[in-house]
Amino acid sequence: MKKTYFISDLHLSENRPKLTALFEHFMHNIAPQAQAVYILGDLFDFWVGDDEKSPLISRVQAQIKQLTEKNIPCYFIHGNRDFLLGEKFAESCGLQLLPDYKIVNLYGTDTLICHGDTLCTDDVNYQTFRRKVHQKWRQRLFLLLPLKVRIKIADKIRRQSRHDKKMKSAEIMDVNGEFVCQIFERFNVRQMIHGHTHRQNIHQIPPHFKRIVLGDWHDDYASILEVSEQETYFLPQTAR
């Protein structure tokens, strides 16, 4: 049976080895069954440049390369934590980078895929920050800094983000329903898949739209969406 897998928001880091093991289990035992695998952002908890080397990065690189060498394409849309992941890393393992919004045909259904952070328009402070850090000249300047300095800056931003989340309401950090409907109309699709909010669900939106939200990963649970010609559902998946 033809099938495609979607994952996002793993937030892999050196201090979460069980998460890395869970990702490796997925890539070794589940992903090879697919026609394609889509990673919709925040694969890593942070990314400061393709020049960083670590055991974690090498392990993830190896898993993606093993999959793509089996002629199973692996696609990636940048998240808010790993938007600096670049062509150098992608080329090293066969990962295919996609734009922020991409329409893919899933067994006859045109589907818009994205990370999901752009849909959270009520979070004005975040959207302002996002526009700034996505400016190419800022990114080029940042990548010119020494690696140790970039890591310190990323860690500071990450800690500030955690603090800000505690101060924001759940509604602000979720998607804006009106904007979502505008996106459906703009791209002329009836189905959307995204991550970012960590609120795994399949929403039916009248009159005929479907919005599928990928969940985040935990040490003992992986949010994996399987799409086939017959059905769309989340796999039950626990740590190995």
UniProtKB/Swiss-Prot annotation:
Substrate binds at N80, R81, D123, S161, K165, K168, H196. The keyword Transit peptide does not apply. This is UDP-2,3-diacylglucosamine hydrolase. It is found in: Cell inner membrane. HAMAP family: LpxH. The keyword Lipid biosynthesis applies. Keywords: Cell inner membrane, Cell membrane, Hydrolase, Lipid A biosynthesis, Lipid biosynthesis, Lipid metabolism, Manganese, Membrane, Metal-binding. Binds 2 Mn(2+) ions per subunit in a binuclear metal center. Hydrolyzes the pyrophosphate bond of UDP-2,3-diacylglucosamine to yield 2,3-diacylglucosamine 1-phosphate (lipid X) and UMP by catalyzing the attack of water at the alpha-P atom. Involved in the biosynthesis of lipid A, a phosphorylated glycolipid that anchors the lipopolysaccharide to the outer membrane of the cell. Mn(2+) 1 binds at D9, H11, D42, H198. Belongs to the LpxH family.
